Amino acid sequence: MIAYLISGLRRTLCLSLLMLGSVHSMAQETIDFSPDAPGATTGVDIMKQGKIDWETGIGLEWDRRNGEHARTFTINTSMFRLGLTPQAEVRLQIDECITHTPEGNFGGIANATIGTKIKVYEGGKVFPKVAFMGTMLIPGGSNAHYLPKHLGFQTHLLFENELSSKFTLGYDLGAEWNGDTESPDLFFGANLTYQPSERWSFFVESYNRYNSKRQDDWAKPGQDSHFNFMSEAGLAYKVSPRLYVNTFYDISFNEFSRYSNIGLGVAWLLN
């Protein structure tokens, strides 16, 4: 596992040096964009037509819920967003992880998706901005440790209200099915963002899932639950009009002291 950790850190360091080396040449640019990362809920903004955004990072998850004892290191998560039209973007994501358990280590592709986000409504003084997001989860083979065995889908309606010049409230309603469970999860998330300056932003959010079938991995050992209650807090810093860096931290309210997830990331407008 140490080798994977070193490999992931090396990739991130090289990427950071590459991008930070470009900051000076980008200082005079006025181009701006809005990354989706970080956060479990998704914003309503669409990439401008023809523009490509790369959002990447690393993370470490510690999970002892329901008697498990696993540490998962995300070596690399990469989301590519391409502005297809003024109203829609195409989204591609692939994550690579390694997990350490008392029984041994395993790793591989942890997430592979293709999807779209479509602008529905621009919003008004009272009414929120609205967007639709649809995602297809690509299945893995019989030896895949993380990917679903069957094709899965996610559909979300995204909303955003500007409460003031510094505060924004976003909320996310959706359904997610990985192809392996009897029924989909219903998703609800709410995100409050505070932006005190042009460069800094801070957020806290609650994101939750409900399944009509009780899930034993959402509760203490020997128990099960219809609900999975999670929360995340984080911040982002705008290095330049094309480059953001961010960090986040997640907890689980189902078993507060038995789960944590921390990550670092960057978002880069490539063109």
Kindly give the residue locations of the regions a language model identified:
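Bacterial N-terminal signal peptides
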Residues: 12-22
